[in-house]
């Protein structure tokens, strides 16, 4: 498997009924594969195509997975935005990466993300085609930016093609360095899928009765690869929105978790 669409198709056809548990719902790999193709259609209608950037300012939720798959289909680039980002960091991402759309939730923990977005320089937000709200709250109104819900994308007809190639740029992560601003690192689809398979094999994720706890944020490299390694194995996993020690400890017991990562 050398592309994200191939990875999702394999998981859906070989382990389609394997479950993904989130705080709000339970869904399957088969559901995810279809949702990714629906979201891809919705993003394509917004003008997202090969090489375009999609900002992910999200905790570990279902929409993160659907949007990742959609970017894979379109040959677009998923830009990981740390959930701790505030006005300065978000403005920096928009200036340097120029995402066509940004996906977000109205709050993460005790932080009101809508207030943060409203502080962003309007001229910068106007460079985004749309802001995609990925929770069930009322859609926000931001001057100079079109706002819509993730559910709007999910209601699209699924695409029946894929523009993603092995060497298509796929994801951007930021890393700390010697300068005040983060550095950006770009990975293609083949690099990501092959590494996830290597991690899957190393950790023996295909072992009988395997159950994974996604305790690390997907906006970081470790959490991101741990997620895709689970998908590569077609293994069921538990996906809390953010790490809370007591909650995750309970998940370890309730779901009989065999694989968990920390950092």
Roles of regions detected by a PLM:
Residues 17-61, 65-69, 86-91, 146-152, ...:
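Conserved AMP-binding/adenylate-forming core of the ANL superfamily
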Residues 28-30, 170-194:
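Conserved AMP-binding A3 loop
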Residues 73-148:
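Structural core segment of the AMP-binding/adenylate-forming
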Residues 104-118, 216, 243-244, 257-263:
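Adenylate-forming
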């Amino acid at each position: 498997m050398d592309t994200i669409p191939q990875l999702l198709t394999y998981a859906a056809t070989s382990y389609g009924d394997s479950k993904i548990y989130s705080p709000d719902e339970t869904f399957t790999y088969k559901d995810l594969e279809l949702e990714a193709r629906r979201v891809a259609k919705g993003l394509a209608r917004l003008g997202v195509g090969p090489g375009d950037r999609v900002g992910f300012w999200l905790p570990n939720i279902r929409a993160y997975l659907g949007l990742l798959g959609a970017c894979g289909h379109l040959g677009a680039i998923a830009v990981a935005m740390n959930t701790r980002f505030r006005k300065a960091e978000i403005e920096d991402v928009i200036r340097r990466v120029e995402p066509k759309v940004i996906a977000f939730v109205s709050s993460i923990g005790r932080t009101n993300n809508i207030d943060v977005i409203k502080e962003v320089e309007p001229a910068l937000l106007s460079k985004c085609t749309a802001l995609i709200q990925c929770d069930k709250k009322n859609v926000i109104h931001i001057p100079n930016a079109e706002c819509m819900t993730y559910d709007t994308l999910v209601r699209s007809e699924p695409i029946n093609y894929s523009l993603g190639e092995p060497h298509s740029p796929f994801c951007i992560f930021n890393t700390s360095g010697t300068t005040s601003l983060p550095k950006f690192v770009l990975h293609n689809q083949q690099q990501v899928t092959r590494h996830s398979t290597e991690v899957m094999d190393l950790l023996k994720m295909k072992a009988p009765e395997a159950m994974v706890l996604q305790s690390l944020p997907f906006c970081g490299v470790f959490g991101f690869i741990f997620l895709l390694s689970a998908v590569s194995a077609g293994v069921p996993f538990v996906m809390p929105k953010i790490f809370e020690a007591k909650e995750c400890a309970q998940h370890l017991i309730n779901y009989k978790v065999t694989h968990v990562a920390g950092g």
